[in-house]
Amino acid sequence: MNTEQLKTKLQTLDIFSGSIDLKFFEGFMSNDSYLASDDNNKYVVKIGGNREHYGVVNSHEVEASKAGYRAGISPKVIYNDDSILIFQYIDSNEITFEGIREKETLKRIVSLIKIIQKKVVNYLEGPNLSIELFQTIKNKITILKERNTPYADKFNNFVKDCELFERKYESHEIVFAHNDFYFKNILDDGKKLWLVDWEVSG
């Protein structure tokens, strides 16, 4: 869906009034998202839908996002269908790549992780995907090899490392997790941290 197609779709929704301006968010690796502004409000619009090659199921992302909102750490889902997700806009700054490594920031992120494991999971209402992390990694490596990636030779050691960690942690408790603490998925409004992009949670 290009920008003009997206704008046309948004104009059919009761959410927006007047002219709509779209600003593309740079730097996200697995999705396209826009800041959508009309005459009165701002929203974040994410191009959604199922993306099998990423293991993304739209209905799960919606439910996980709603659970995150109920737990107080994610923006509200305003609208969703099979092709787009619209979220409340949070006036905030992204955590930078350097900033995410700072000690105080890491403490705040650990607090977020605890909320996910102890609170967000209790607000899930729809089917909850079980993400088997190590198997997901192996599946993606298989896909990349089938597509003749130039990095195939480097995967062997990576697979061995995964198997080592898998053996080490196979007896640990399984908990609900966000699974994508990419620095652009963490927002700081000056008072607290917010999490977005629950597409690979489980």
Give the label of every model feature segment.
Residues 2-17, 121-179, 189:
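An alpha-helical support segment within catalytic cores of ATP-dependent transferases
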Residues 23-131, 136, 146-154, 171:
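ATP-binding pocket architecture of kinase catalytic cores
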